[in-house]
Amino acid sequence: MPSPSLRHRFGHRIRELRLATGMTQEAFADKCGFARTYMSRIETGGANPSLDAIKVLADALKVDLSVLFTDI
């Protein structure tokens, strides 16, 4: 079986960090200013977020950008 794509691993990392904060996907999407459907696509690897969007994710999670890429 092929390894998960970078987008899927990144999305899983975002979901993992979001869940650690206790936020729902909808609350997290609102905090980021994204539609919930876009957030769902990020978390499932269906979207390829821009660098600006990745910075928004990090800020909403209150983590350094590098944390988003740890262990992916």
Put a short name on every predicted segment.
Residues T44, V63, T70:
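Short, conserved catalytic or interaction motifs in soluble domains
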Residues H8, L19-A20, N48:
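Short amphipathic helical patch at the helix-1/turn junction of helix-turn-helix
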Residues G33-N48:
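Recognition helix of helix-turn-helix/homeodomain-like DNA-binding domains
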Residues I14, F28-A29, M39-I42, L68:
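Conserved hydrophobic/aromatic packing and binding residues within compact polymer-binding modules
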Residues H12-K31, V56:
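Short basic helix-loop element that most often maps to the first helix and adjoining turn
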Residues D52-V67:
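DNA major-groove recognition helix of helix-turn-helix/homeodomain DNA-binding modules
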Residues M1-R9:
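A detector for short, charged/polar N-terminal pre-domain segments
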